[in-house]
């Protein structure tokens, strides 16, 4: 089927999305303390909820701070890693259709990413974001 699965393993939340023929398939969020548990739990739930078999998955891409704990293929599938700021920029560009933008990613912290054509770069950020506020509540 050729589905690409993207997984952002964050400190407080793991986000997962599928892409098939340039269409986004049902993004979900999972909360778990352990990043490996969070990744595999999110992946299993995503496949189950969307009636996708492992053989339908062409590739898995991981990013986020928790991706440092992933050293090999996820469930034996071709697995790659990408920089979180690049993933944020590419995702925002894909969804918006814009070639120039400032992307604000609010997670445990808040980052600012500049997209200008094919150039995507981190331009700053702060240590407070939605994850911080959620943790304080």
Where are these regions (language model features)?
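Short glycine-aspartate micro-motif
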Residues: 2-8, 57-62, 101-105, 125
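Short glycine-rich, Thr/Ser-proximal phosphate-binding strand/loop in the N-terminal lobe
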Residues: 3-41, 120
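A short acidic Gly-Thr/Ser loop motif
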Residues: 8-12, 65, 104-109, 128-130
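Short beta-strand-loop/turn "lid" adjacent to the catalytic site in phosphate-handling enzymes
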Residues: 29-32, 43, 48-84, 119-122
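Alpha-helical scaffold segments in soluble metabolic enzymes
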Residues: 38-45, 69, 90-94, 135
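Conserved phosphate-binding catalytic cores of ATP/NTP-utilizing and phosphoryl-transfer enzymes
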Residues: 70, 75-104, 109-119
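Glycine-rich phosphate-binding loop plus the immediately following alpha-helix
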Residues: 118-137
């Amino acid at each position: 089927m050729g589905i690409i699965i993207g997984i952002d393993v964050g400190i407080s939340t793991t986000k997962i999305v599928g892409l098939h023929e340039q269409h986004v398939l049902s993004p979900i969020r999972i909360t778990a303390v352990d990043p490996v548990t969070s990744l595999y739990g999110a992946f299993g739930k995503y496949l189950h909820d969307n009636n996708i078999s492992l053989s339908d998955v062409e590739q898995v891409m991981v990013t986020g701070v928790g991706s440092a704990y992933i050293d090999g293929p996820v469930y034996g599938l071709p697995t790659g890693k990408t920089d979180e700021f690049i993933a944020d920029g590419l995702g925002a560009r894909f969804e918006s259709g814009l070639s120039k933008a400032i992307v604000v990613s609010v997670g445990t912290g808040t980052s600012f990413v500049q997209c200008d054509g094919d150039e995507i770069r981190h331009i700053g950020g702060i240590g407070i974001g939605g994850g911080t506020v959620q943790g304080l509540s």
